[in-house]
Amino acid sequence: MIQETIVITQNSSGLAHIAPMGIHIPAEAQDEFIILPFRPSTTLNNLLESKTAVINYCDDVRVFAGCLTGRRDWPLKPAEKINGQVLACALAHTEVELVRVEDDETRPKLFCKAVHTANHAPFKGFNRAQYSVLEAAILISRLNMIPLEKIQTEIDYLRIGLEKTAGDRELEAWGWLMTVIENHIAKEGVYAGNLPGAGSAISKEGVNAASQSGTGAAKAGIGS
């Protein structure tokens, strides 16, 4: 199973790096987690250096969308058992240690074991708008790999659930993502069509963050 999470690593100077990532959880070992960051990436470098990470379970989709649109500054607090940082808005988190590495030229497999798990707030149920934002974020991470027509079709479908069920946080996150798409279309010189819900303009760094695997994108889920 793959769970969409927020992975926080830090370097030897204590600088935290926040990255949305799809974490693989083997059915036969629920205390084992496989993290697959692309090479090169900050997450990979930090994990190999520190041998630790924090996996955060979060229902605030602004964190996922924010990391893909140049908004990586989210409140953190110290981890409890390892030298690391926890997302302050996480519903729960798991602190892990690196056990072994299966190397790969593109995407190494980092096998980690849980050393501590804590719950912070109750999970209040599934929400279609949150799903829409997560799926849109994955599309954003693949802007340079997917035809714009397909992106438009997917966005039109995801917007249905968003418009019916979104709260303020989901609408804000959606707006950030739509702005990235519009900026990408403008950069490519293609007619934008009727992409909805654009938020405030963001920098070119934000667009780059959505299209480079080293800063937030992944080809199977979201990752960095």
Can you name each region flagged by the protein language model?
Residues 1-93, 97-199, 222-224:
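Basic, polyanion-binding surface patches
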